[in-house]
Amino acid sequence: DVAPPCLQYGHARAEALGTAIHFKQASCDALPYDDASVDVVFSSMFLHELPTHLIKAFFREAYRVLKRGGVLINMELPPNDALAAYDAFYLDWDCFYNNEPFYKDFRDLSYPNLCSDAGFAEDEFFQATMPRYTYVSETEFSQAASRDAAFDADTGRLSDTITWYAFGAQKNG
């Protein structure tokens, strides 16, 4: 994170829970890691908070720091073109009335192109949807994990029945 107060809170929370975590202050467009030095780059509900130029810079940095075989995973809002018109409208409405200046622009981007423009091969892109783990049985969760992404009215909505969306790519080249 770039915000010292967020890092201080995270550190205090981790210590209170007895969890050893090392936090680093850094910007997503200049990660403090060597080339090909990490196995996983993960972001959660982060990209829609950035202007487009920083989103693209983040993908280039993720590609740079990932080892061969490493994985980029982004848990995010689903793209506009994956949803029914009403559901896309609902999220656009939420963007405007929730004071989210970059939310809609992000959702209008091509997620596969974000990956391929950063260096990932087109066939390395993946996307997945998963139900909220605490809402469904382990059997339903396992079944969801074994099928292709399915978009519905709960995808990306903060509700008890939320369907989480993730996308990314594996660096094989």
Residue ranges of predicted features:
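A short acidic, Gly/Pro-enriched loop at the edge of an enzyme's catalytic core
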Residues: D29-V41
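Core SAM-dependent methyltransferase catalytic element
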Residues: A118-G173
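A generic structural signal for alpha->beta connector loops
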Residues: G18-A20, G69, G119-E122
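C-terminal alpha-helical "lid/dimerization" subdomain adjacent to the S-adenosyl-L-methionine
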Residues: I73-S137
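A short glycine-rich, Lys/Arg-flanked "PGG" loop and its adjoining helix->strand segment in the class I
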Residues: K56-R68
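Class I SAM-dependent methyltransferase SAM/SAH-binding core
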Residues: D1-A30, A57
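A short SAM/SAH-binding and catalytic strip from SAM-dependent methyltransferases
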Residues: D39-H53
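Conserved Rossmann-like nucleotide-binding pocket used by diverse enzymes
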Residues: K24, F42, I73
